[in-house]
Structures are given as C-alpha cells and as structure tokens.
Design a protein with these regions (language model features):
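Short hydrophobic/aromatic-rich motifs at helix boundaries and adjacent loops
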Residues: 1, 17-19
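Short cysteine/histidine-rich metal-coordination sites, predominantly Zn2+-binding motifs
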Residues: 97-107, 117-128
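N-terminal pre-ligand scaffold of iron-sulfur
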Residues: 20-98, 109-112, 127-139
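C-terminal motif of bacterial Sec signal peptides marking the signal peptidase cleavage site
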Residues: 12-16
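Sec-dependent signal peptide recognition
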Residues: 2-7
Length: 139
C-alpha cells in the first residue's frame, strides 16, 4: 500500500500536464521554422499599438503566404495567412476584413481573436512575445 500511493501521485502528476492547447496540426500548411521581430515604433507596424488592429507581414522567412499579427487588447495573436482548409494555391491567401480574415477560395471567415472558423481546421497560430516595443513571432 505504501508503494501504491506514491505511484498514484506520480501518475496523477504525469496525466495532469498539458501542452496549453497549442495544436498546429494542419495537412494543408507546411511547418516552417522561423523567428521574426517587429518594432512597434516603426510606422509600418504602429497600427498594432491599438486594440483590434492587425497587420499583414509577408517576409520570405515566414512561408509562402505570410502572417497576420493582431492586437487583442490583452496581448497579440499571430496566424499564418494561408487558408487553413485549402491546399496552397493562388487563391489561398487570407484577406483582412476588420477583426476577421477571409479565405477567397471558399469565403470562409476566421476570427483574429480566436483563430476559429466554421470548417475543420482553425487558423495556424504562432507564438508571440512582447518585450517593450518589440514583438517576436516564432514557432
């Protein structure tokens, strides 16, 4: 009995660990390893200083379709700009529509607050860290 209790406690601790719900599995969007820094003091990124504003960033290091970065008011979200439920094609770059992005291939709308849409896959999300006026977006 004395050996069972520590074993149960260790098992409980092991199964209570989580990955913070960060799931980026998507068969349509390849995994790219990248790290980008954006200076919010620069005019091209200054919209991110205001709640519910987004910018599109299409540097070569972030993959074929770029990323959207969004100020939620309590932090920042970054999502791949490729339609999450379409194979990469000429119509699969999301377009900005207020606090949402829309896939031109199927007119599906996704929230920049949550990344959710109505189809199977949500937007592919990337990690964001803020240090002063610098945002680091990476995966």
């Amino acid at each position: 009995m004395k050996k069972i209790i520590p074993l149960l406690l260790i098992s409980f601790l092991f199964f209570s660990c989580s990955d913070n719900g960060f799931n980026n599995n998507n068969p349509y969007i390849p995994n790219y390893s990248f790290s980008v820094t954006l200076n919010l003091s620069f005019a091209s990124y200054s919209n991110l200083n205001f709640v519910s504003n987004a910018i599109y960033y299409a540097g070569p290091e972030v993959g074929p379709k770029g990323i959207y970065v969004f100020n939620t008011g309590s932090g920042y979200n970054a999502f791949d700009a490729a339609c999450p439920n379409q194979a990469l094609s000429s119509c699969s770059t999301l377009t900005l529509d207020g606090i949402n992005v829309v896939c031109p291939c199927d007119d599906e709308e996704y929230s920049l607050f949550t990344g959710q849409g109505k189809l199977q896959y949500p937007l592919k999300q990337y990690r964001v860290e803020k240090n002063g006026n610098i945002l680091r977006i990476y995966n």
